[in-house]
Swiss-Prot record:
Pfam families: BCCT (PF02028). It is found in: Cell inner membrane. InterPro entries: BCCT_transptr, BCCT_transptr_CaiT. Pathway: Amine and polyamine metabolism; carnitine metabolism. One of its GO terms (molecular function) is (R)-carnitine:4-(trimethylammonio)butanoate antiporter activity. GO terms for cellular component: plasma membrane. Catalyzes the exchange of L-carnitine for gamma-butyrobetaine. Homotrimer. It comes from Shigella dysenteriae serotype 1 (strain Sd197). Belongs to the BCCT transporter (TC 2.A.15) family. CaiT subfamily. This is L-carnitine/gamma-butyrobetaine antiporter. It comes from the Bacteria.
Length: 504
């Protein structure tokens, strides 16, 4: 009976400060767009050039941590006493779909163009060497290295959630073993949680800022509807409504509905591109790129380009590592929630092997298709970007395929539904982090989850009003800085507590 009377409403100290901070930042940005752009460029340059090395070392250390979990003393430990909540197939699909939105399709279709037009290591733009290295860098940025980071933190949160029976899931609640209960539940812990939530809100906004133009450009191609900010707002509203429907079904039913559809559809679409684009070339290009990745891996891991100062590692590697860092806690909480009953080794291998295969397939197929279209002069990406923007260039890479109308319909549906999954995962984590007394196996209040979806949608609209990729990239970079330290503290806290309380 006591459990029925527990208050599970929002926690004011971690609910209102992020909203106020985000509101002030958005107001200052919209108030003077020119001044905001100056600040945005300065912040991006400072963080990537001065602190880029720290992000690179973070990823390397976390990779070694993954090996320690897989082959160390906790490998066979089970995350909870219950059997797995989801089947292995649904489990993998939920993980893949939660990390695959239209924002990922955005980069998968266009990323290789930037790599070959502004290549690393002093290579000539659009040269043979640049093209040989283009896909290899995509496999590097979206391969085992970042997934190992996610799996380590997922194990940490699953341990605190299901083994230690933690009642509240937010970063500060995991820091008790490291800083003590007084500081974890006091001002220090509140500051940590607010940094996390502010960064996460902007991260979700950036994903919507990348996803929405793809959908609206699809609508312009299919229906002739002009791409406007008002149309962007309508699309975001539709995502919020669909998310509310999934939430109303509960995590298990809603999660499966939201994840299975884009997962199956994405593999169907990728299979179509693979067949009609050139299966032989794609397999040869992938095989060669794996070899290039292995050859250049040490340089890629530690590439900061301090002498030539070409800007490639700052603009791409550091940006992507900040992207992974800023989403690490949010996604790890969600992935931990659906991994109850799994062993540590099973969770680590499931994420790194399964999700690496998924992202490598996506980037290989889409990147190879874009490269073929460029080499055959079927589309002029620089001209499309200059005249219409990046989203239009991406749409044209899909429209150039056979049966273009059917292909565009498939891409439109995939982008739309996949982003619903992202919003669902993020709203769930935000609600869990801003509510009190939510225990393992329970769901946060419905209205709180829907409320966060609405608020994040507003942030996405504001970022779209700013225009361009630089504000989106800067939001990720700036948000990744405080979470860089938060992630490290969560990791150290897990290691310390596990050594004391997770013995045979």
């Amino acid at each position: 009976m006591k459990n029925e009377k527990r208050k599970t409403g929002m926690e004011p100290k971690v609910f209102f400060p992020p909203l106020i901070i985000v509101g002030i930042l958005c107001w200052l940005t919209v108030r003077d767009l020119d001044a905001a752009n100056v600040v945005i460029n300065a912040v991006f340059s400072y963080v990537t050039n001065v602190w880029g090395w720290a992000f690179e070392w973070y990823m390397v250390v976390m990779l070694f941590g993954w090996f320690w979990l897989v082959f160390g003393p906790y490998a066979k430990k089970r995350l909870g006493n219950e059997p797995p909540e989801f089947s292995t197939a649904s489990w993998i699909f939920m993980m893949f779909a939660s990390c695959t939105s239209a924002a990922v399709l955005f980069w998968g279709s266009i990323e290789i163009y930037y790599y070959i037009s502004t290549p690393p290591f002093g290579l000539e733009p659009n040269s043979t060497g640049a093209k040989e290295l283009g896909l290899a860098y995509s496999l590097f940025h979206w391969g085992p290295l970042p997934w190992a980071t996610y799996s380590f933190l997922s194990v940490a949160f699953a341990y605190f959630f299901f083994v230690r029976k933690m009642e509240v899931i937010r970063p500060s609640s995991t820091l008790v073993p490291l800083v003590g209960e007084k500081h974890a539940k006091g001002l220090f812990g509140t500051i940590v949680d607010n940094f996390y939530l502010v960064a996460l809100i902007f991260a979700m906004g950036t994903s919507l800022g990348l996803a929405t133009p793809l959908v609206t450009e699809c609508m312009q191609w299919l229906f002739g509807i002009p791409h406007t900010l008002q149309l962007d707002a309508i699309i975001i509203t539709c995502w919020i409504i669909l998310n509310a429907i999934c939430v109303a079904c509960g995590l298990q039913k809603g999660g499966r509905i939201a994840s299975d559809v884009p997962s199956y559809l994405s593999f169907l679409m990728l299979g179509w591109v693979f067949i009609v684009s050139g299966a032989s070339f794609i397999m040869n290009y992938f095989t060669d790129s794996v070899g290039m990745l292995l050859m250049y891996l040490p340089r890629m891991l530690f590439y900061t380009d301090p002498i030539a100062k070409g800007g490639f590692p700052q603009g791409w590697s550091v940006f992507y590592w900040a992207w992974w860092v800023i989403y690490a806690i949010q996604m790890s909480i969600f992935l931990a929630r659906i991994s109850r009953g799994r062993t540590v080794r099973e969770l680590c291998f499931g994420m790194v092997l399964g999700l690496t295969a998924s992202t490598w397939i996506l980037w290989t197929v889409l990147g190879s298709n874009t490269l073929l279209l460029i080499d055959k002069n079927i589309i002029n990406i620089p001209n499309l970007i200059e005249q219409y923007g990046v989203a239009r260039a991406i749409i044209e890479t899909w429209a150039a395929l056979p049966l273009s109308t059917a292909t565009m319909w498939g891409f439109f549906i995939l982008c739309f539904i996949a982003t619903v999954t992202l919003v669902n995962a993020c709203s769930y984590t935000l609600a869990m982090s801003t509510c009190r007394e939510v225990r393992g196996g329970e769901e946060p209040p419905l209205l709180v989850r829907i409320g966060w979806s609405i608020l994040v949608g507003i942030i996405g609209i504001v970022l779209l009003a700013l225009g361009g990729l630089k504000p989106i990239q800067t939001a990720i970079i700036a948000g990744g800085c405080p979470l860089f330290f938060v992630n490290i503290m969560v990791t150290l806290s897990f290691i310390k507590d596990a050594k004391q309380n997770w013995k045979d």
